[in-house]
Amino acid sequence: MNQYILAIDQGTTSSRAILFNQKGEIVHMAQKEFTQYFPQPGWVEHNANEIWGSVLAVIASVLSEAQVKPEQVAAIGITNQRETTVVWEKDTGNPIYNAIVWQSRQTAGICDELKAKGYDPLFREKTGLLIDAYFSGTKVKWILDHVEGARERAERGELLFGTIDTWLIWKLSGGRAHVTDYSNASRTLMFNIHTLEWDDELLDILGVPKAMLPEVRPSSEVYAKTAPYHFFGVEVPIAGAAGDQQAALFGQACFTEGMAKNTYGTGCFMLMNTGEKAVASKHGLLTTIAWGIDGKVEYALEGSIFVAGSAIQWLRDGLRMIKTAADSEAYAEKVESTDGVYVVPAFVGLGTPYWDSEVRGAVFGLTRGTTKEHFIRATLESLAYQTKDVLAAMEADSGISLTTLRVDGGAVKNNFLMQFQSDLLAVPVERPVVNETTALGAAYLAGLAVGYWNSRDDIAAQWQLERRFEPKMDDDKRTMLYDGWKKAVRAAMAFK
C-alpha cells in the first residue's frame, strides 16, 4: 500500500488539505472557505471552531476523493496563517473569544502605548520584530483585557493560548499536545529568538501569564498522534509545523545561507535564509526564525509587502479594467512601457522598508496619451518595484548579493511580471513545477521526522524548475525606472 504525507495548509480565507507522494508531487487537494468577521472597521476575526470544522472537512474530502485510506497517511504536516491568535478553555476546548487575525488592527492602541513608553528597541532586540498590531502578543493582551475574568483564569492555568498551528495540533491530538514550533513562536512578540525561550520581561510588559503558553518544539518532529475519533479510527503522527512563509522557504529548498524566495499572494512575502545568524535589520526588515531542525535553529530576514495580488483584484473588481486576473498580462504586453506612469498601491499603507500605515495609494505621470494598457502595466510593475525595495534592504542588512530568486504564489503565472521582475532585480527568477510550496514545505518537515524522506539533500534534489526568467534590461534603463519609482513613493508619502 502506497504511503502519503498529508499537509494541512490553514490560510487566511480557506483551509486546504493536500496529499503528497514520495516524489513531492501533489496527489490530490481539497479546499474549503470559511467566514471572515469584521466587527469594526480595521478589525478582522475568525471563528476558531469554524476553522477546525473546515480542516476536518478537507481532510475527509481529500482522502475520499483520492481513495486513500487513513492508514496510508505516514504523517501530517501543518502550515498556517501566522500571528492569528486563539485563546481557549483547557477543560472544554472552547475558545473564549474569536480568533484575532494577523491583518486585524484592533490592538493598534495597545501598540501606540507600548511605543510611547519606549519599549520598541527592547522588543526589536529580543524578538526581531517591531511593535505592531500584526503580531500575536498584543492580541493575547487584548483578549485578556476584554473578556471578563480571563487574565485570572489564565494565571490559574485554565486558559491556553495558541497560534493556529497550536490550536490544530491540540484539537487533532484530542488535547494531548499544547505545542508550537520555533517559526510560529518567533512571530508572537513574546519569544526571545536568541535564547529560544518565552521571555519573562516581555510577558510582564504585555501582562500575559506564562502558564497559558505552548511548549516550543522543533519544526520537524513527532508532536503527538491523532486522536482516533478525529482521524477515522487511526493514530497518525503529527510530525511537522511551520508558519506559512517559512514553510514556503522550506518547500522551495532554500536551505543554504543567501537563498531567497518571494511569495506573490494577496501581499508579497520575501524571505532570505541567513543560516545560524540572526541578522539585525537596519532597513525595516523583520528578523525571524526560519525553522528549528536537528537541534539547531536557522534564521531568516523577512520583508512584507501589503498589496500585491490584491492590486490585480482591484483592477478587476474595483476599476473593472480586466475581466480576469490573467487578462492583465495580455494588456501589459500591448505597450512597450508604462509611458512614465507609476502606480503606488499603498491601499493599506506601505510595509518594508517604509512601515508607513498612513500613506494611501497614488498614481503619477498621467498624460492625455495614457491608456488602460499603460495603467494595467504600471500596476503589475508596482509588484516588482516593491520587491526590489525589499531586496535592496536585504542585501544591505545581510551583505549577501542574491544570485537567483525563487518565486511562488498565484501571481507568478504572469510571465510579463516575472520577466519584468528579473529585469529589475538583474538576477534570474526561477518558477518551480510545484507552485504549492507552502503545503509542500509542511509535508517535507513532517516526512523528514518520520523517515519518509531521508535528508534535506533528497528534498533539494526533488525541486524542479518550470521556467527560468533571465534579465534582459540594460543598467541605465533599470536605474532610470527605479529612480522614477522612488520619486513616486516619496510623493505618495508626502500626500497625507
From Swiss-Prot:
GO terms for molecular function: ATP binding; glycerol kinase activity. It comes from the Bacteria. GO terms for biological process: glycerol catabolic process; glycerol metabolic process; glycerol-3-phosphate metabolic process. SUPFAM superfamilies: Actin-like ATPase domain. Its EC number is 2.7.1.30. GO terms for cellular component: cytosol. Activated by phosphorylation and inhibited by fructose 1,6-bisphosphate (FBP). It is an enzyme of class 2 (transferase). Keywords: ATP-binding, Glycerol metabolism, Kinase, Nucleotide-binding, Phosphoprotein, Transferase. The phosphoenolpyruvate-dependent sugar phosphotransferase system (PTS), including enzyme I, and histidine-containing protein (HPr) are required for the phosphorylation, which leads to the activation of the enzyme. Sn-glycerol 3-phosphate binds at residues 12, 82-83, 134, 244. Key enzyme in the regulation of glycerol uptake and metabolism. Catalyzes the phosphorylation of glycerol to yield sn-glycerol 3-phosphate. PANTHER family: GLYCEROL KINASE, SUGAR KINASE. This is Glycerol kinase. It comes from Geobacillus kaustophilus (strain HTA426). The gene is glpK.
